[in-house]
Amino acid sequence: MTSPIIISIKKNYLSKLEQQNIKIYKPFGIILFARNISNFNQVRQLTSSIKSLSKKTLIFIDQEGGIVNRFKNFSEFQFKNNFDFYDIYLKYPSLAKQLVYLKSFITNYYLSSLGIDVNTIPVLDIPNSKTVSMIKKRTFGSNLKINTILTDILVQSSFEFGVMPVMKHFPGHGLTNKDSHFTKPVTNASTKALNHQLSLFKTFVKLPMIMTAHIQYQNWDNHNIATYSPYILKDILRKKLKYKGLVMSDDLVMKANNQSIEKSIDLSNKSGLDIILDCSSDWKRYIKILENFKKTNFFNNKNKILFSKKTSNRRLQSININHYHDLYNELIKLYGI
């Protein structure tokens, strides 16, 4: 049985302490950042090492492409932001679909070959004129039809290669000009505007995993951010949208979460979270979190594992990935975009 936490590690290899604790506590997931990545062989060795210590621990990454890129120095991962594809779609719909397909195919090919199980995409926030740039650039735009078409291409590619998608940031990060990494966004948006933010989550409600937003939605819960809101996670997500998958938090070390560890775990338990994400890489902190899990019975009633990695139907070694890279680059050059 795994512990209901997704953790991070400090370097591009496991320290003795990390090896020991991963083996003992078996975290639900370990999320990789740029600091954990040097080259492809090193990543394969790292993911293999993690699996040897805890077979059921899933390897996560946030590899959206564009401004969120954990492979920044790798030529294989140089892609446009999602919002750029929305702009391209307005002029060349077929081209935009082809480019998103190629980007997704290439990304998932590498993630699968590196032993990565989960990618925290798609971003389903619906932007408007006030949306903070850090979020807007990561979306496929405000047109629901276009967004749905491009998101579906991205999601299907993930499943094709056995990489689980995680939709985010529920119930929507599009109504604020604040970045929850640095402060706690609070929105007074109307119920109508809030329901509009749910549109894409309804469309993709059958995806196996969802990440919450560290935002306070005054008209739904004027006390808690969505991550800690029973009304948002139980009444809206579970009852209204009938979501059956796994619910994980955004990173608890983000500035939008100003609660103590004890309070965070208590609120997470009451809100209906299944898994928490903590990217501190701090094992003293992780041990404290795990101790608080036991106090709140988080272990007993939250540890649902709803996903087991499917073996890809494709034989990775038979794919000429350079062909897909060349086609992507040729199309970009041909259309001058």
Locations of regions flagged by a protein language model:
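N-terminal small/glycine-rich loop or linker at the start of catalytic domains
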Residues: M1-P4, E64-Y89, I126-M134, P165-T187, ...
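Glycine-rich tight-turn/loop motif centered on a GG-T
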Residues: R35, F77-K97, T131-L150, K178-N195, ...
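Extended, intrinsically disordered, low-complexity segments
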Residues: K295-I337
